[in-house]
Structure formats: structure tokens, C-alpha cells
């Protein structure tokens, strides 16, 4: 999608939001305010005294008309002009409204059965919360709770886990046996509820089958039941095609408030489209956005159906595909944040020195031969310290045992200690004047001892410096500073000189 398309889509969504917010007061009057007050006479002897829909004239007439139209099977080509002019259209709208009344009637019958059967099995209400499942279970069990065990019919109604819980609870319940009259009333109510449920499914099947030729494109988008509801409340397919999308979204909106309860949880501006399956399949935070989109597409589909175009539903399939494509786009995860690598450091050009002094300094500070041997390892040879018997780093070739001969360390002229020329002359002068002695060391061997073993006396204490003292005393006569001149007789003159 290009940038221009994205901007146009944003403008379209903004326009739809403005249309939703700019709802006239006249439109708000169409929102029906309903107070649900389910008043059931618990003292009624028969269920027919409180549930009168199945015996009503309207109920029987609609079912007869439905059976007649199912047998005829009129074709879409027979419908000419506005759809509202077709006699079957009114039957479809009335049948769709009848399903709502059937739902309310089923709730009344469920409450009647629950109150009557609580005398026999009061815990069953909490174990089976679904109304129809509860009614079927009550009809199957009756007055004998032992039917919970190994009952094939009950396995078609409840799950195995629920059956096990019901059977365990039934064995410990404190309920009382029902009389034959009470049991007969309960079974009558169960039969009525199951018949109403069958009639509701017949109506659903008929509406779905006939909506495919009255409004095929609209029913493809939101389903046949929802399409029939919004057509009925709008006053026909022609009126629906003339309504803007923001008003189509409000069709069927009710302010449902239970008497005595708060109305803060009521969802405003939510109609039949908001509660349709295509919208409710999305996460809750996308429901309103999806309802706006679906209502806009329903308006387009209704305009196509009002002119009897695309009877095969091609436009409806295209619009639904576009809706699903947008739904997928909304639910896509955000793009993965790209991790940018660190930029190369801006190191300036380094100054590289050269010359004789620099080369000598590198030779002096470079690796010694011993360090090179310690860093060197042989391939496929086990080191002597492989078992970590000694702490420290490996010695490499330096730690290998050789022939046993001591090799004199080679002196590297580049790495030996440097002394100045002045210090060299001073040391040389001392070695000449003092016979190589200094205040730290002399030329005598460091291994000389004052104890000696002789064959004559055995252990003998010897002074290693005695020889030096003897030489010094002998030389003191001639080289002493206190010595005097000696008298020497000259052979020629025979005189003595001093």
C-alpha cells in the first residue's frame, strides 16, 4: 500500500468517526429503552398459564406460511420491483421477530422448571447452567435420579465429566420425591420448551434459505439472521439502502437496564451489527472499529440488493473478503524493531614512529625466548600438567623434560640491562684499584667454607681469607706508605745511597 492509499484510508476512518459522533437527537430516539423484568408466577399450576406463545394465533399462522413457502420454493427471478412488495418478505420479517419472542418464552419456561424441580434435585441448577441442557436433563431423569449412571441418552446431552459430577451429587442430595401431578407438570413444560426450540430452528433455516435470494449480498456479510433483523427494523431493504452507515450501525440498539440495577455497564450505540458473529469474533478492543467497517459494507451490499444486482452474491463475497483482509491487518503483530549495529569508531590517524631508536626499543620490550617457549605448544602431545596437579598457567615447551643437561642461558644484547658509560668507567676503575672487590661482593667464591675435612686431623677449621691476609702482609713491606728507603751499596762507587 502506497503512502497516498494509507492517507486516504485514515481520512475515511476519521470521517466515519465524525459521522458516528454527530448523531442527531432524532436518531437517538430510535434507540429503544427496554427494562427487563422477568415476572414469573411461581404458584402457577400449569406452564400454559405463563407461556402462551405456542398457543397463539400469530405463532401458528407464521409456521403455516413458512411451510407453504418451503414447498413452493420461489425463484429470485420472480421478484420484480422492490423487495418489500413481495409477500414472502413480510413473512421473513415476522418470522425473524418471532425468534426473539421464542427466546424469551424459553427463558420463562426454564425458570418455571427450575423452581419446580428444585424440590427433587436443587443442586442440578448449578451443575448444568445451560437452559436447554437443563431442560433435557430434567426430562431424562424425572423422579429417578439413579438414571444418571450408565445412561446413553444422557451422554448425548452432557459431557462425561458433568455426568460424573451429577451422579455423585445425586447420591447425596437432600431433595424430596415429586408427586405424580408435579412430575406431570414438569414434563409438560419440558415438552413445550423442546417444541419451541424445534420451531426456532425451523424458522432459522427458512430465513437463511430465503434471505439468499432477497438480499444475497447482505446475508453473505453479516449472516441471514442479522440481515433479516436490520431489514425488519429499517422498514425494508429499500429504506436500508438509503440509510447512512452511521445509522445502520445503530439499528437494534437497546438500553437494556434491569430494574434496580446500574446502567453503567450498558454499551451505547451497539446494535445488531455489533453483536453479529463477524464482529464478535475479534478481540474486544476492535469491536467498535469492526462494527463501523461492517456497517459501511452492509450499506453498499444493501444498495446492490435493492436493485436486484449480483444475485449470485459476488459483490457480497468481495466485500466480505475485503473486511477479513482488514481484520487480519488490524491483528498483525507490530513489526520487529530493527537492531542497528554500532557505528565504526572514528579513530584518528595514529602516529607511527620509526627509526633506529624505535626499533631497538621494540626489540628490548618484545617477547623473550623463554616467553616464546612458554607460549608454544606441540600438536597431539599431552602436556605434563594436563591433570592440573600444579596451579598456574601451562609452561608449554618450557616445561617439557629434556636431556637433563643444563643449557646456559643465552644473553640477548637487545634485552640486557643498560648502564651508562660513566658508570662503566667507575666500575672498571674500582676493579683495577680494589682488585675487583666492592662493598657488595668480591672475587672469592661464594661456596668457600671455613670448615674443611683433612685426612690427618679430620675436621679442621680453615679461614678462607687467611691466604689473602698473608699476601697482604708480605706486600705491605714494599708497597706500604709508611715504608722507608733501604741502603743499597753501589758497585761502581761503593758508596751507600739512601
Swiss-Prot record:
Entry keyword annotation includes Nucleus: yes
Q: Using the record for this protein, list the coiled-coil segments as residue ranges, or answer none.
A: 84-119, 180-214
Residue window of motif Nuclear localization signal (NLS): 350-363
Q: Where is this site: Interaction with U4 snRNA?
A: 246
Keywords in alphabetical order: Coiled coil, mRNA processing, mRNA splicing, Nucleus, Ribonucleoprotein, RNA-binding, Spliceosome
The record lists the membrane-crossing segments as none
Q: Please state every residue range assigned to the domain named Nop.
A: 214-332
Give the molecular function GO annotations. Answer: U4atac snRNA binding
* Entry-linked Pfam families: Nop, Prp31_C
Q: Where in the cell is it found?
A: Nucleus; Nucleus speckle; Nucleus, Cajal body
- Which GO biological process annotations does it have? mRNA splicing, via spliceosome; spliceosomal tri-snRNP complex assembly
Q: Which GO terms describe its cellular component?
A: Cajal body; MLL1 complex; nuclear speck; nucleus; U2-type precatalytic spliceosome; U4/U6 x U5 tri-snRNP complex; U4atac snRNP
Span list, region Disordered? 333-356
The UniProt site entry described as Interaction with U4 snRNA and U4atac snRNA is assigned to 269, 292, 297
Record-annotated site: Interaction with U4atac snRNA = 288
Q: What does this protein do?
A: Involved in pre-mRNA splicing as component of the spliceosome. Required for the assembly of the U4/U5/U6 tri-snRNP complex, one of the building blocks of the spliceosome.
Entry similarity comment: Belongs to the PRP31 family.
Q: How would you summarize the oligomeric state and partners of this protein?
A: Identified in the spliceosome B complex. Component of the U4/U6-U5 tri-snRNP complex. Component of some MLL1/MLL complex.
Q: What is known of its domains?
A: Interacts with the snRNP via the Nop domain.
The protein's name is U4/U6 small nuclear ribonucleoprotein Prp31
Amino acid at each position: 500500500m502506497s503512502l497516498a492509499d494509507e492517507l486516504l484510508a485514515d481520512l475515511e476512518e476519521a470521517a466515519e468517526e465524525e459521522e458516528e459522533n454527530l448523531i442527531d437527537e432524532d436518531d437517538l430516539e430510535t434507540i429503544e429503552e427496554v427494562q427487563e423484568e422477568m415476572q414469573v408466577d411461581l404458584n402457577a399450576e400449569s406452564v400454559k398459564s405463563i407461556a402462551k406463545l405456542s398457543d397463539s394465533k400469530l405463532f401458528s399462522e407464521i409456521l403455516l406460511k413458512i411451510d407453504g413457502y418451503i414447498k413452493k420454493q420461489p425463484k429470485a427471478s420472480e421478484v420484480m420491483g422492490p423487495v418489500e412488495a413481495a409477500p414472502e418478505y413480510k413473512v421473513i420479517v415476522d418470522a425473524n421477530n418471532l425468534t426473539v419472542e421464542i427466546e424469551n418464552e424459553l427463558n420463562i419456561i426454564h425458570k418455571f422448571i427450575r423452581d419446580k424441580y428444585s424440590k427433587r434435585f436443587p443442586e442440578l441448577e448449578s451443575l448444568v447452567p445451560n437452559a436447554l441442557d437443563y431442560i433435557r436433563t430434567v426430562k431424562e431423569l424425572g423422579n429417578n435420579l439413579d438414571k444418571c449412571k450408565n445412561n446413553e441418552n444422557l451422554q448425548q446431552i452432557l459431557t462425561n465429566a458433568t455426568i460424573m459430577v451429577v451422579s455423585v451429587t445425586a447420591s447425596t442430595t437432600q431433595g424430596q420425591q415429586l408427586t405424580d401431578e408435579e412430575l406431570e407438570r414438569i414434563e409438560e413444560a419440558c415438552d413445550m420448551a423442546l417444541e419451541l426450540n424445534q420451531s426456532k430452528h425451523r424458522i432459522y433455516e427458512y430465513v437463511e434459505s430465503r434471505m439468499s435470494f432477497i438480499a444475497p449480498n447482505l446475508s453473505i456479510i453479516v449472516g441471514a439472521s442479522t440481515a433479516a433483523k436490520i431489514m425488519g427494523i429499517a422498514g425494508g431493504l429499500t429504506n436500508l439502502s438509503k440509510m447512512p452507515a452511521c445509522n445502520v450501525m445503530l439499528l437494534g440498539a437497546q438500553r437494556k437496564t434491569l430494574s434496580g440495577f446500574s446502567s453503567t455497564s450498558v454499551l451505547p450505540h451497539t446494535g445488531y451489527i455489533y453483536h453479529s458473529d463477524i464482529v464478535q469474533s475479534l478481540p474486544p478492543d476492535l469491536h467498535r472499529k469492526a462494527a463501523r467497517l461492517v456497517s459501511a459494507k452492509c450499506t453498499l451490499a444493501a444498495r446492490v440488493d435493492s436493485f436486484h444486482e449480483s444475485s449470485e452474491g459476488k459483490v457480497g463475497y468481495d466485500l466480505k473478503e475485503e473486511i477479513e483482509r482488514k481484520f487480519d491487518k488490524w491483528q498483525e503483530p507490530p513489526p520487529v524493531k530493527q537492531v542497528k549495529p554500532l557505528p565504526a569508531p572514528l579513530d584518528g590517524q595514529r602516529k607511527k614512529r620509526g627509526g633506529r631508536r624505535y626499533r631497538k626499543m621494540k626489540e628490548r620490550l618484545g617477547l623473550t625466548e623463554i616467553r616464546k617457549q612458554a607460549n608454544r605448544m606441540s600438536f597431539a602431545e599431552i602436556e605434563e600438567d594436563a591433570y592440573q596437579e600444579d596451579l598456574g598457567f601451562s609452561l608449554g615447551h618450557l616445561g617439557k623434560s629434556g636431556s637433563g643437561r643444563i643449557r646456559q642461558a643465552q644473553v640477548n644484547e637487545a634485552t640486557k640491562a643498560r648502564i651508562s658509560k660513566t658508570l662503566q668507567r667507575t666500575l672498571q676503575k674500582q676493579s683495577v684499584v680494589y682488585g675487583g672487590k666492592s662493598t657488595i661482593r668480591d672475587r672469592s667464591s661464594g661456596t668457600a667454607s671455613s670448615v674443611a675435612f683433612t685426612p690427618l686431623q679430620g675436621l679442621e677449621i680453615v679461614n678462607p681469607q687467611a691466604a689473602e691476609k698473608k699476601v697482604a702482609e708480605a706486600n705491605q713491606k714494599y708497597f706500604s706508605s709508611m715504608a722507608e728507603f733501604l741502603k743499597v751499596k753501589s758497585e761502581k762507587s761503593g758508596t751507600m745511597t739512601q
